[in-house]
Amino acid sequence: MALTLQGEWIKIEQKGGPAPGPRSSHCMAVVGDKLYMFGGELKPQFHLDKHLYVFDFKTNTWSIAEPKGEAPSLSCLGVRMVAVGTKIYIFGGRDENRNYSDFYSYDTVKKEWKFLTKLDEERVPEARSFPAIAADDNHVYIFGGVSKGGVQSTPFRFKSTIVYNIAEGTWSQLPNPGPDFEPRGGAGLAVIDKKLWVVCGFANSTSGGINDYNSNKVQYYDLVSGKWIEVKTSGVKPSGRSVFAYAVIGKQIVIYGGEIFRDENGHLGPGTMSNEGYALDTETLVWEKLVDGGEPMTPLGWTANCTGTVYGKTGLLMHGGKQPFNNRTDDFYFYSF
């Protein structure tokens, strides 16, 4: 019998205000009763604005935060965001000319930006787009992503994981995961029970980019023992995919959609998107397929997504993304079970 998990999609009403509109390759995070959103593209490879959009779950309205302090100077796509306490952290991304952005924080109480790290300099992380991001109370974790070259000779995609110590304001790198660990962009990253989980992503082939592929591997780094482990999962496994939506719900990593076959024109084309969802139990290592309730979902990838607690439940928040005909949407959804 196939393993399934019943949940419900809720389409979030957007009642007004200066909304971000249709876009993909953007990022978002929740602090309290507000969601913060940044970056993205409407046409493939062309960035949009550099506003920080704020959605208020109490009123279901959008606003734009005043760019107070050391705000990002570059409008970018492939950027990532995570919340720690009352601050959000924004890492990387690029514009259509492959100018790359840096590392910033935004204090949601003071409503003020702060520049933290100039990327691509000695002894700091190299600039990149489409990495994966996660955090615990003390650290921001960045895995993989697409390189621009930087100060060192790098692969087209990274397989390294870099760590920002929030209290000290310093960067370090986790141990090398070994030769069999795939360099990837557009992967999922989550911290659960002192383990840093890496899920799926678009991987480098051994033939130098000709046969790059979407992976469905799952690995974790044990933050206590300092070791990388590749796990064997069972159940109803997802196919290989990248740039999917994901969130942590309890001990489960929930994923939705994503690109399952790359377009022959790369990022410029529509690719083949999925409309399936899955949940991985990180204790039993069993995948279950999500049975959708509520709003029917279209194949979708390249969304902004995060874990959020709204309507009294914790679940997956997802905005925008690329649809099957290479169009972008501004739909806003919440999934929980």
From Swiss-Prot:
Q: Name one GO cellular component term.
A: nucleus
Question: Per the database entry, which stretches of residues form a coiled coil?
Answer: none
Which pairs of Cys residues are joined through disulfide bonds in the record? none
Q: Which SUPFAM superfamilies does this one have?
A: Kelch motif
Start and stop residues of the Kelch repeats: 34-82, 87-133, 139-194, 203-248, 252-307
Q: Does the keyword Iron apply?
A: yes
Q: Which gene encodes it?
A: TFP
- Its recorded name reads Phenyl-N-(sulfonatooxy)methanimidothioate sulfolyase
Please give the organism: Lepidium sativum (Garden cress)
Tell me which Gene3D superfamilies the record gives: Kelch-type beta propeller (2.120.10.80)
